[in-house]
């Protein structure tokens, strides 16, 4: 659980973890994919939970770079003393994580067949799929968070109830932005909903968060439209504008 500390203390937030001592910090960045909704400060942040599974097969694909199409495959690496190739990944909305499944191994093989059929043969995956025998494959399954517009949610977090109250005039006139202070949850930042594109969005998101946290007064290096498009408050503004 995440709790605000008394204003007199040096820390702004207390993190309580079952069976462990509490942690205290001035700055907390929530980078927990779909699990951020377990925290009271983020229960109303809307996004979809998406299950994804990767597949790892024995064999060297000899790639020097990642190939990407319907799916992707990364260059081979040594895993537990054996050269193996990892590829994927499935995309199933509103499904939980858990153990890898043979059906999703097959999905990954079928995706690879569309983008790199030669690698499919090289690794013996065609025969494996035809026989339905996946015992030599390993996998990893987890969940992603994906938001409306396939854009991540990155930036400082505001108190939703107070935001909706202070800016309620927007319900009557979307252009009439009240001269009110945004009720920030000071020291609390969010980085989630990177979906299946985290390798692209995470680096610039980290830079933006750094500048927010360090109190940069000039964020002009980033397009204003970008900051607005990924900001957590966009959902609260949308609630008001469209009277949701």
Locate predicted features:
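C-terminal catalytic lobe of FAD-dependent flavoproteins
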Residues: 128-244
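Short beta-strand segments that buttress and anchor functional surface loops
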Residues: 14-18, 193
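Short glycine-/acidic-enriched loop or helix-start segments at secondary-structure transitions
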Residues: 39-41, 96-98, 200
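A structural signal for short hydrophobic beta-strand segments in well-ordered beta-sheet cores
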Residues: 2-5, 73-75, 154
């Amino acid at each position: 659980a995440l709790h605000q500390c008394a204003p007199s203390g040096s820390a702004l937030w207390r993190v309580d973890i079952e069976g462990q001592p509490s942690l205290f910090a001035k700055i907390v960045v929530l980078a927990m994919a779909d699990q951020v909704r377990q925290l009271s400060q983020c229960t109303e942040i809307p996004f979809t939970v998406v299950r994804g599974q990767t597949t790892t097969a024995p064999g060297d694909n000899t790639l020097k770079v990642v190939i990407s199409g319907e799916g992707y495959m990364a260059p081979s690496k040594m895993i537990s003393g054996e050269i193996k190739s990892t590829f994927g990944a499935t995309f199933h909305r509103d499904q939980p994580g858990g153990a890898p499944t043979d059906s999703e191994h097959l999905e990954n093989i079928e995706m690879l067949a569309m983008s790199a059929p030669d690698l499919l043969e090289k690794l013996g995956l065609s025969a494996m799929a035809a026989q339905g025998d996946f015992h030599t494959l390993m996998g990893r399954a987890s969940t992603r968070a994906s938001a409306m517009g396939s854009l991540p949610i990155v930036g400082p977090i505001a108190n939703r109830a107070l935001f909706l109250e202070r800016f309620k005039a927007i319900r009557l006139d979307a252009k009439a932005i009240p001269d009110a202070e945004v009720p920030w949850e000071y020291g609390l930042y969010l980085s989630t909903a990177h979906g299946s594109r985290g390798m692209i969005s995470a680096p610039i998101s980290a830079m933006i968060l750094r500048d927010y946290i360090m109190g940069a007064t000039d964020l002009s290096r980033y397009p204003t439209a970008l900051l607005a498009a990924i900001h957590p408050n966009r959902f609260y503004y949308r609630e008001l504008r469209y009277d949701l």
